[in-house]
Amino acid sequence: MNKKITDSIIYVGVNDHQIDLFEGQYVVKNGMAYNSYVIFDDDIAVMDTVDINFTNEWLANIEEALNGRLPKYLIVQHMEPDHSANIENFMKKYPQTIIVGNDKTFKFMSQFFRNDSFLNTLVVKNGDTLSLGKHTLTFVFAPMIHWPEVMFTYDSFDKVLFSADAFGKFGANDVKEDWGDEARRYYIGIVGKYGVQVKNILNAASTLEIEKILPLHGPVLSAPLTHYLEKYTVWATYGIEKEGVLIVYTSIYGNTKSAAELLKNELLKLGTPSVEIYDLARSDMAEVVGKAFEYGRIALASPTYNMELFPYMDQFIHKLVERNFQNKTIGIISNGTWAPVSGKLIKDKLSLLKNITFLEPVVNILSSVSAENKDEIKWLARELAKGYSISTSDVDKHNTNSLFNIGYGLYVITTNDGKKDNGLIVNTVTQLTNTPNRVGVTINKLNYSHYIVEKTKKMNVNILSTDAPFSIFEIFGFQSGRNVDKFKDIGVHRSDNGLVYLSNYINSFMSLDIVSSIDLG
């Protein structure tokens, strides 16, 4: 499948729908893409090969793209077999080609192919350049992203960064899906251990003028690239993407599951903006590991098994430790009958990591959840939900200071249809009377939010501040809440009426009950 990327760069990669496990461990229900590119100039360069199972398709793609011309260079950015397996087959067809790589590239090449016939080579160093004519390629070494020989290639003519495995994702390119979730799962699984190295290469890339990023997996990323770079910065620095609490549990006879479900319900009562719960025995481990990096607050619940951690929890924690998991707040629920040590084992293993805060004490269950345990779980929920809820104990519900922030500007009204949160940009909010306090909000009755407000008789009004970015207007003004989750990448809290309000870009918010409505036509 050939595709034009720029006037002089053609995509010649392949999609793999035969694969079920990437690297023998990651479930890829939508397959994988193995990307390869051809740069056309006075001299032609082919960027990387593809998996061995797609030799014929890939070579046919290249032949079609070349249209009778011959390549001068094969640039090898990464020697992992899903990208290098066809070097030998390529050289048999185009023996005049010069293979470009670094010292480690050729060391690994000799180990994989045991072939001394690759004599037509060009060894490059970090920062070296290669002219193809109009195109000048600069090689930027990116060791341990995620192998030691990896290098990126910057094309200053088309302002393109060939990024090897960085900025890749799971999934074939002929499947339409959100980039973020599968890119996160890919990053955490494949590159997550090497945050320092990723941060260093991001700093180096920030000095370049880049309009497109061409990874070895996943789609080509085009300007504006801010969203993708911001995500990688958060992942590389082990930052928090999503406010809320992640609950991860294992259970043998259902008692630990009951404790985890009780914690979930208590967190929801407290207005926690997002609560996700996963049973490790019935979940994709890589997905849950990715979720653990997404949240800043996590609860782990596990029984003891043969005086050790239950195997799924042990494996989960091993994967966190292996990936330098850090900067988290952890609550622990331990269960056991005759040797209840799971809580201690969880804490001992995670104590090896940086900036892990444990909520003490551990909730210790003996076989089944007792009345005392229920109180302890409620306490744990309050600790995990701190700062998330606005309740009557925190504020005066009749405080009218928000009214002074009403002016000519824009507002986001937030609602909930009983299944999910929704939000909408409006431009007219007016204080109608002072005694009693009455506020008028104008909503287009064709919008889904109008239907929700009429049904639920409540809403929150978020008064936007002057620093609200244009992306806020795009999210809440340019798409329908019927079909998308508008709060997917937005920080929120939840007020005691059960509705969310924005945690950023607002001066204040008001929780309103609907006492009457007027149809203006």
Q: Where are these predicted regions, by residue range?
A:
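Active-site-proximal mixed secondary-structure blocks
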Residues: S393-G521
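FMN-binding flavodoxin-like domain, especially the glycine-rich phosphate-binding loop
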Residues: V175-I213, G218-V220, L262-E276, V288-D394
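Conserved beta-strand hairpin/beta-sheet module of binuclear metal-dependent hydrolase folds
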Residues: N2-I62, F152-D155, K159-F162, T256
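Short acidic active-site motifs
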Residues: N86, D284-V288
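Short N-terminal or domain-adjacent regulatory/targeting segments
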Residues: K212-E241, Q315
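Metallo-beta-lactamase
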Residues: K3-D7, I44, D51, G101-A223
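Active-site metal-binding motif and surrounding structural segment of the metallo-beta-lactamase
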Residues: D42, N53-V100
